[in-house]
Amino acid sequence: MSKSKGNTVDPESYFATHGADALRLYILFMAPPSDGVEWNDGGIEGTKRFLNKFWENIETLSKLKELDGSNNETNIVRKVNQSINSVSNHLNKFEFNTAVSDLMKINNDLSKFLKNNEDISKESKDMIIRNLCTLLFPMAPHITSEVFEEYFNEDLINTAWPQVDTKNLKDPTYELVIQINGKKRHTRQTDIGLEQSEVEEICKVEFNMNLSDYKKIIYIPDKIINFVG
């Protein structure tokens, strides 16, 4: 975009229709600062949807039943920690577009967690909300400040930048047992937390299994997948 070429965008109209956070986020997400870009209204719609989903996820998470000793959240807590690491690195290098991309990814991961879980420890709930709001704050200060103050009754601007837990960065693996009609045929070292569709894809690609040959597929997460013919 260039004023001399007459193809600039008036921000005032987008403030009114999409909000300042969505506009700021889209500008940062469009491309690296050194690159020229073509404005796309569909792109700002995408960042607005992301912010709406972020708000919805935090609200849903805040209402999740708190259960001491719950270990349901091990994987999502690790993913948040990985996001602290990646977003911090990208911001330090002024790679704003990839920082936004990482935040969109962790927001999708949180959506999956909320879809499949009904409880969480208070410690993990607080950790996730505090860190995700803090990571997104430089790029979307209005929505994150409001969400943060509503949950913690604190000002987000006074919150320290999150620190990476270096011991909780690497995804642990387990030995997946692949059975056919209840008999073990293969094993594979696999990341924990994979969904059934992801495990089926591994079996199809790596072990040349034709999934349509089987009448039923039984999947026990992080343990066994059994193909019944």
Functional labels for PLM-detected ranges:
Residues 13-189, 218-221:
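Helix-rich, typically C-terminal accessory recognition domains appended to large enzymatic cores
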Residues 2, 8, 30-34:
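An acidic, gly/pro-interrupted, aromatic-rich
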Residues 4-7, 189-191:
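Residue-level structural signal for beta-strand termini and adjacent loop
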Residues 10-11, 165-166, 194-196:
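A short local loop/turn or secondary-structure capping micro-motif enriched for an aromatic residue
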Residues 7, 169-171, 210-211:
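Short solvent-exposed loop/turn micro-motifs enriched in small/polar/acidic residues
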Residues 66, 176-229:
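NTP/phosphate- and nucleic-acid-binding module
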Residues 1-2, 185:
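Generic structural signal for well-ordered beta-strand positions
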